[in-house]
UniProtKB/Swiss-Prot annotation:
GO terms for biological process: translation. Signal peptide: none annotated. GO terms for molecular function: structural constituent of ribosome. The keyword Ribonucleoprotein applies. GO terms for cellular component: ribonucleoprotein complex; ribosome. The keyword Ribonucleoprotein applies. SUPFAM superfamilies: L28p-like. This is Large ribosomal subunit protein bL28. Keywords: Ribonucleoprotein, Ribosomal protein. Gene3D superfamilies: 2.20.150.30, Ribosomal protein L28/L24 (2.30.170.40). It comes from Anaeromyxobacter sp. (strain K).
Length: 73
């Protein structure tokens, strides 16, 4: 499973940690991904979305189960 947002395509970043002795070690910064049940074109799927896309409202979350009587009124 790829560590990539399915909406914006954000993925891991690669950089260096540099010690005081100027030694360089590779490090990866992973995106903050969440698994979400989303409604995509009328189809409910599990997708991996970054929290930035969730906050921006780019994803319509799918509800769980049938609506209750109070929600229909």
């Amino acid at each position: 499973m790829a560590r990539r947002c399915e909406i914006c395509g954000k993925g891991p970043l690669v950089g260096n940690t540099v010690s005081h002795a100027n030694n360089k070690n590779k490090t990866r910064s992973l995106p903050n991904l969440r698994s979400v049940r989303a409604n995509l074109a009328g189809e409910i799927r599990h997708i991996r979305v970054c929290t930035r896309c969730l906050k921006a409202g780019k994803v319509v979350k799918a509800g769980r189960g049938r609506p209750t009587a109070s929600a229909q009124a």
